[in-house]
Every structure is written in structure tokens, then in C-alpha cells.
Amino acid sequence: MRQPDIEIYLRDASQQAVTDWLTQAVGPCSPWQQKGKTFKCQAGTIPVTWLPKAVGKWHSLLLDSDATPWEDDIACARAAFAALGVEIRCAPGGWQEEEAEEDADRWISISERGEEQILWRTD
């Protein structure tokens, strides 16, 4: 089932590299507009939010649409790793607010080591 939005976390990725990838994968990006600590743009018709250093060295990328080229976070994370060559983390499936805290700490890491399930405490 297609997720209503896509969110991945990228380690040490530059905003410009992400912009270039989004332009290629989704569509031309409008100029980034900074609002507080976040940056927003449109990639094609998709609203995008970039939060630098959302969790330590990890940047958050949110595509706020179900009309992305990817079915879910994992598919997007795989494409991002292939294009950018930096470690990517994402939730293993759609995340629900009412999930147990232990489940909320389960993540998928995609890197040069391959794909693995990890425990990542983000608080």
C-alpha cells in the first residue's frame, strides 16, 4: 500500500546534492524557502521539507505527497542511497503515532554495508 508521504534521514548529505537528485527523480525544484530551521521547496508538484541536522548528523527529508515515484520510505531510501552514496535511514513501514515506543525505534539503514534493521533512538 502506498504511503501518504515519504520521510527519510540522510547522513552528511549536502542540500545541493539532494536538490539535484530530487530534480532528476521527481521534477524541477523551486528555490528553497527557509522558515526557521527548515527549508521548503516544490519538486515538480510535490511539497518538500528539508530539516538539516534533525537528529545529530542526520538530515530529514519529507516529501509530503502520495504521488512520489516511490511506493514507500524504503523504496525512496534505496533510490537516495544509489544516487547520493550516503547512509540513509527510514522507518520499516508507515509509522503510526500509537505504535509502541520499541517499534518506533526500529529503523532500516541502507549504506555501503547493505540493508539492515537497526534500533535507533532519536530522542
Q: Where do the model's predicted regions map?
A:
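Short, extreme N-terminal segment that most often corresponds to the first beta-strand
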Residues: 1-23
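Short, surface-exposed coil-to-beta transition loops
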Residues: 46, 73-74, 102-105
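Short, hydrophobic/π-rich interface segment
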Residues: 67-90
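Acidic, proline/glycine-rich low-complexity IDRs
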Residues: 83-123
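Short amphipathic alpha-helices in soluble, non-transmembrane regions
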Residues: 18-27, 75-79
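Short secondary-structure junctions
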Residues: 23-38, 116-118
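A general secondary-structure signal for short beta-strands and their flanking turns/coil
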Residues: 3-5, 56-58, 81
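Short, intrinsically disordered low-complexity segments
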Residues: 30-70
